[in-house]
Amino acid sequence: MSAITEIYAREVLDSRGNPTVEAEVYTQDGGFGRGIVPSGASTGEHEAVELRDGDKDRYMGKGVTKAVANVNDIIAKEIVGYEVTDQVAIDKAMIALDGTPNKGKLGANAILAVSIAVARAAADELQVPLYNYIGGFNAHVLPTPMMNVINGGAHSDNKVDFQEFMIMPVGAPTVKEAIRMGSETFHHLQKLLAADGKVTSVGDEGGFAPDFANNEEPLEYLIKAIEAAGYKPGKDIAIAVDVASSELWDNDSKKYKLRWSTGEEFTTEEFIKYLEGLVAKYPIISIEDPIDENNWDDWVTITSELGKKVQLVGDDFFVTNTEYLRKGIKMGAANSILIKVNQIGTLTETMEAIEMAKEAGYTAIVSHRSGETEDTTIADLVVATNAGQIKTGSMSRTDRLAKYNQLMRIEDQLTDLVAKYKGINSFYNLSEQARQDIINK
């Protein structure tokens, strides 16, 4: 193998037109890799630090020239000379160079851009696909997609409290067919909304964000769209929601408030019953962040009450951090973790979180951010780790479709003999009976 000879970073733009960090890595024998970092809109308070300039006269304070300079002036000097395939050592060297628990000195956006670029340069030098380089010959599971077709909460300007309403083609035989089913349902949803005079412009993640009367109306539209596309709700396409409850939690009153819709308030016990009612009524298979990120005991409560029926995903709760995940596993909080590479800041730490989850029987869902780029690393990562589920937006916007297109390419490369799409069985954190209940709902 050959050594890294050059690392260079620049400021580019994400899908929202905000600056982000792009890094390039070059090797002695001609290997080349590029990594671009995404950015979130609703972020967990314990996430690794995304370093921004804060200069209000430039990009309204969102510039990343400091992070870029940290790559070019500090990280490059440390990492040039490393063997490009020594990913773990390189990631650990950058973590040590930063020296803070949250990567606040150099910026997780600076470190992650280099981490991704290094992996891509190594794959390029070895002339193998990225998923193959990261996961070896065992990489073969194509993920069940979570397609965010209706946006609410912090991701929109409407009167819907839940942040995301998603469809999951759990009955598809392949990822290609899953994407087709999702696309058809998306277009039927658009027709249904338009016929009712609702706005069909799309939000950050490619989903629709019209006004609805309450949080159940989007679910009713999803059922209608699934049926209009010729599929059976539950059996063919299940529903997932991201409550993003930290946005609803009021720490003073200790209640959840439907702040975007009715203004109704719930105690934790009442809010759990509210969610339980939705699960009983609709073919919901997954709920993300149903409880505020700092209320650990309440997470244990909802897991004991709902965790055998549906997937309970920790996003802001775990922030892709093995320390928080380890605590959650020990306490019995949640049964799934959302994996966002920029929440933790290196590929090595990301993969450690995925493996820890799988060993504990938790599912790991590899996820995009609301501010995305053309970088398709997460599509390769989800296959490399056989994680089984991916969350990467709706059926519109090139930054989202780039990941779906990459998954279809990977499925072709693996061929039908090797590639495996598990659909409903990707929910190995739920019992066979629970999965059947979703299918039969």
Curated annotation (Swiss-Prot):
Keywords: Cytoplasm, Glycolysis, Lyase, Magnesium, Metal-binding, Secreted. Its EC number is 4.2.1.11. The active site is at 205 (proton donor), 340 (proton acceptor). It catalyses: (2R)-2-phosphoglycerate = phosphoenolpyruvate + H2O. Gene3D superfamilies: Enolase-like C-terminal domain, Enolase-like, N-terminal domain. GO terms for biological process: glycolytic process. Binds a second Mg(2+) ion via substrate during catalysis. Its cofactor is Mg(2+). GO terms for molecular function: magnesium ion binding; phosphopyruvate hydratase activity. Pathway: Carbohydrate degradation; glycolysis; pyruvate from D-glyceraldehyde 3-phosphate: step 4/5. The keyword Cytoplasm applies. It holds the Pfam family Enolase_C. This is Enolase. It comes from Ligilactobacillus salivarius (strain UCC118) (Lactobacillus salivarius).
